Amino acid sequence: SYVSQNCKNLTVLQKLLSEITWEQILLTSDVISYFVADCALQLFGQKPLFFQYLQGKISIGKYDILLDALIGDRQRAMDFCQKYPAFFAHEYIWEPGEDILGLIYLSCKNMGSRKAHGSYYTPTKVVKKLISHLDIEHMGKVLDPCCGTGNFLLQLPESVDLADIYGTDTDAVSIRIARLNMALKYPDADVEEICEHITEKNFLTEYDRTGFDTIIGNPPWGYAFSNEDKAVLKARYATASGRNTESYDVFIERALEILVPDGTLAFVLPEAVLNVKAHMRIRTILLQGSSVKSLTFLGDMFDGVQCPCILLQLVATGKPLSTVGMRIEDRTRTFIIAMERTVVPENFSFRMTDEEYRVLEKIKNSIPVCYLADHADFALGIVTGNNKKFLSAEKTEHSEMVLKGTDICKYHINPVKQYLRFEPEQF
């Protein structure tokens, strides 16, 4: 869940979403902003009085400017409120550390749109776990370069001053919500300071602040860059020089550029960054000038996304990567690497203890070893496009048996239940 399971506002939001579905409301950006603004008004201490706010009868003082930026045209908002007053009768309460504003926004946004932009919102438990691994007393100046509605920044401990918190994103509505979240987290904050620190900018091409001690976040995964964007990035970043540009690789490269010496980078990333060939450029960069302080394997953590993810915490040492002191955690164990290991950009394999590593090294170095490379053929499994049409439970003279991945076990295969006439031109 994006928020904690005991978030009291969840029930309220579920009622709102049910009403929206019942009324078949077209969820435009403006309409979503009205729902978020209504909630924000109540979190600042007002009851469900959104229409009265739009009429100018009530105020939240210096933060009116932040709420107005989210609402936009007041008359259009009033027209919508008058047409659907029940939507604005729900009561929300302020719960520290819960990004209910962000949850309303992401719940209303179209899932297809989020996928196109590579923005899958990070569950709060993942955010808290990432932050728990940081050195809180020495965080210094903190940046989330893809801050969305500000959930990572909300989870920072109270000891981190607003003066040291920065965030940027290309989603204008998300930035307006993040500013409101910062105003709620720091009730005495200056509006100008919030707006200067939380900005709507492209981190890769427009954001020019540097000298950060800590950079945190969940960069976009698989963002669909335009051809124009690719050309700009290719001229600037080594990780964008290949045929396909992976957004999170470029985010890592840029983040390392603007960290202070020995600064910390902590990102939520797909596990593929450690071993897939397409990401070898970023692994080469990491090998040349950083060390891995902590690596946590989380498995599948995002709703509707089958992609194992990791928490990767780096230190920008400016020196070749050292494995000594690296903390490794997965769902079954946690251990520290105490020895220097040979690491190559082709594959970052840190998921073994020192004892296991020594055994494998001994095997490789003491006896003749044969590898699968150059001794095996690799192929993609059959994709028929229509299993009901092409698969059959009956074996014929011309059919072949079909094995699924789950049918292949150690030392045996499961009984064959399906058959296929292999005519690939029909698939």
Task: Tell what function each PLM region has.
Residues 41-46, 404-410:
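Short, flexible beta-strand-to-coil junctions
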Residues 122-126, 147, 153-154, 162, ...:
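Signature of N6-adenine DNA methyltransferases within the class I
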Residues 2-184, 202, 275-282:
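Class I S-adenosyl-L-methionine
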Residues 308-309, 397-401:
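Short, surface-exposed beta-edge/turn micro-motifs
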Residues 377, 382, 402-409:
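Short Ser/Thr-interspersed hydrophobic loop/turn segments at strand-loop and sheet-helix junctions
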Residues 196:
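Short, conserved active-site loop motifs that form the nucleotide-linked donor/cofactor pocket
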Residues 235-237, 382, 409-427:
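Sequence-specific dsDNA recognition surfaces
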